[in-house]
Structures are given as C-alpha cells and as structure tokens.
Amino acid sequence: VNSAGPSGGEANGTDATAAPDATAAPTATADAGAGAKAPTIAAVLPGGGARGAYEVGALSELLPALEARGERVSVWCGTSVGAINAVAFGSRAHLSAGEQTELARALWLSMRKHDVIARIVGIGGVRTMARAVGNIVGTPGAGVASLLDPSPLAASLDRWIDWDRLDANVQARLVQACVIATSLTSGEPFAFVASADGPPRLYDDEVRYVGTRLSGEHVRASAAIPVLFPAVEVTHPRRAAGYYADGGTRLNSPIKPALNLGADRVIVIGLEPFSFGGGRPASPRGPSIADVAANMLDGMLVDQVAQDVRRMALVNSFFVEDVATGTLHSPRSYRLSRGHDPYRPISYALVSPRRHGEIGRIAQQVFQRRYGGFGSLRDIDYTVISRILGSSSQSRGELLSFLMFDQEFVAELIELGRRDAQRWLRRHPRFWCRDASHDLNVGDVDRGVLKEQDALEEFRQRRR
C-alpha cells in the first residue's frame, strides 16, 4: 500500500488491503476545489543504456507543452541511464523548458562510447574479458566482476552534470531528485533522495529512502547493470555505505518513489509499449545468447515499469467513481467510514514506442549502415560485440541499443521520442489522462482483478 499521504493508517496496517502499492495515495485535498495547491509533477525515467536518448526526445516535446500550461516537473526519479537524465534535468531546473531540453539534446548528441566504457579491442579490453572468463571457469586470481569496463563514466558524469547547481536547485526547492540503486548487502532497493525536506518519512517495506547530496557515485551505482558492469561502492551517506548495482534489479514499483515524494501527476517514459500484448516473435530455432540476454535486460529494466503503469491504470479504473452514486461498500465510502482520506486517481502522461522492439530495429538498421562491411573500421568494438551476439539473432539489435552511443543512432532515438510524445499530445490535448481503457487497452475492472494483483504482490514479497 502506498502511504505517500499525510495520514499514517497504511503504515501501521489498519488498512492494508485498500489498494495495491505505488498506484494511489490518500490525500486531504482529493476533492479540493479552486483553493487547492498546484499539483506536484514527477517524471519517472527507466534504464536502458544508450536508449536514454529516447527519453530526451520525448521530454523535448512534453516539457514545453507542460510549461505552456503553467506547470513544471519538480520531481525527477531515475534508474540506470534514467538516473543520468534525472540529475541532468534537475541541475537545469532553474532554466526554461526549452533551454533544458536543448542542453539535454546537445549532451546526448555529443556522447560517444568511450565516454561510457573503455575500449573492448585493446590490451585493457582483452585483459578484462580474459579475467571475466577466468572468473566464470574458476581461475584463481581472476578478480574481475564484469564483462565491460565503465571507468570512463566517472569523469564523464562530472563533465556532464553541474553537481553544485543541482544542489542549489534542490535547496531553492525548485526540484527533488531521486536515484534508485540496489544494495548488494541487503538486496533492497535504495532511493538516494536530494530534497530540501529530506527523504520521505514513512514506512516502506520495499524501498529504503536515504537523504543525501547526490553525486556521480550514486548515479554510477544506479547504472551498474549486473554482469555487464561492476558493482559501485557508495561512500556517502555513511549509514548507506556499501556496494550497489542497477536500481532496476529489485524494484517492483518504479513509480512508487515519485508518489512518496509527493507527486500528484506523473510522466512515465517507456522504452517498450505499455499496452498489453505484443512482444518478440518466437524464433524457429533455439534461443541464442543474445535472445537470453535481451530477455534478462528487459526483465530488469523494462518489464517492471510497464507492469507498474498497468497497475496504476487499473487502480485508477477502480477508484474513479461518481460520488453521487457511490455505495456504502465503495472504496471511497469504505475509507471515509474508517476515518481515512479517500484515495485519489493519479493523472499521468505516458510515452513509449508504438511497436515492441522498435528501438532494437533502429539499432540494427544503424549498425548495418554505419558498421557493416568496411564501416567496421569506424569502431571495431561494435563489430566484435555484433559477432559475439550473432549476425542472425533477432535480439542483436536489442542488445546493441544498450551500448550504441553513436551520433546517428542517438539522433534517430531523439526523433522517435519526439514523434511518440507528439502522438500522446494529439490524443490528449489537455496533456493529462487517467483512463486505463483509453491508453492501455484495459477494459473495466472489478475487485476480482485487483484481488489477483494483491495476491501476486504478496507472492513477490514472500519470494523476496
């Protein structure tokens, strides 16, 4: 149960079955009129390596449209590459929406692979690969924890992000920023929160909130995809010191931190469609290493976001009801009868590609144009990665899209994000929506559907 509201009923278990977590929050102003405070708007940005360019493209359309309505994003929550985008936008919260998005676009178009990972083909890269294989087969003294070396990212983040400006914007209450990473000591997701009010003061059995001044180590920890990149040591604050990996590995409800930071409305950028159905076509042969790896990465970085969006939409369908026709047994009447504020639906804006695997197809096309044939001389690393993944693999493009920090690929993703955001704005002239069936192909739901959601969540918690 999300206990982002001011009352503490959910935290002490008095109303533990009122709603699934991360989907709705009790509020004293649920039915407020003209005197209500301005809504707090959050952006939730998932992980995906070079796919983060898509997020920038979508935001380049959404943020100016939001500003034209007199609204701005004041809560940025990110995981993995979404954490990089979150702190980048947070550090520019003092600028106009147009300036923010133009700087973000310029940053992404300037990124290169060597800004993020060390060369694969070369003495250092061969040594890293050899030590990784040694670890797998149990060679004594192998001593490496990843296939790739992301050491260049530390210096790059300090070039890309003005950490002092981010902190100044936080202290001026222009923005709250939240970076998610997974503790390798406890297995829990940690939300490193930069907020003038400190972290959320509530009980949460899924996410631990830690107030801090954000720095490169928090972002690198959030982006440490297991196996690909090594775990990152976080040294501050001391009470949360330890080694961390990618924040998407254990976070079942990516939207939840944004709501617990006070968000009334959320923008969620997805890297695969949010709607039900679709997916990769079945392969007539057995799965390749690329197929397996792509499914693993989707499970960590994509599926949880889509599931949480669907859960939010289902709960919106359940809790949006006509006050005049509500019955004694309705969720609204039930909560009021227990002395709690009524739940409210969460308005949202959702942007994602129209088709499953669209970003992977673009990566494959760009790779063929840029690095096929004699083009392999541009960057032999991409050719080596492609050979390892297999030239006939349907999932090769999916995996390349995580690592292809190529200007042409980045430009195409920015443009795709722009088009998909424009599509959302055409369908939603008032920007926000809360109709599940309209956006996710979800029909009307009843209590039985939500009971199944609760049972699934209970199973998840027991399994953890």
PLM features: what roles do these ranges have?
Residues 116-148, 293-304, 308, 367-403:
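Alpha-helical membrane-targeting segments
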Residues 36-44, 49-151, 157, 193-208, ...:
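Patatin-like phospholipase
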Residues 144, 157, 324-464:
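C-terminal helical/tail subdomains of lipid-metabolizing enzymes
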Residues 171-301, 386, 395-402:
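Active-site gating loop/helix substructures
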Residues 3-36:
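Intrinsically disordered, low-complexity terminal tails and inter-domain linkers enriched
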Residues 144-181, 188-192:
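Active-site periphery "cap/insert" segments of enzyme catalytic domains
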Residues 268-314, 347-349, 359-361, 366-377:
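Helix-centered, glycine/charged polyanion-binding patches within enzymatic domains
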Residues 297-337:
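C-terminal amphipathic alpha-helical segment
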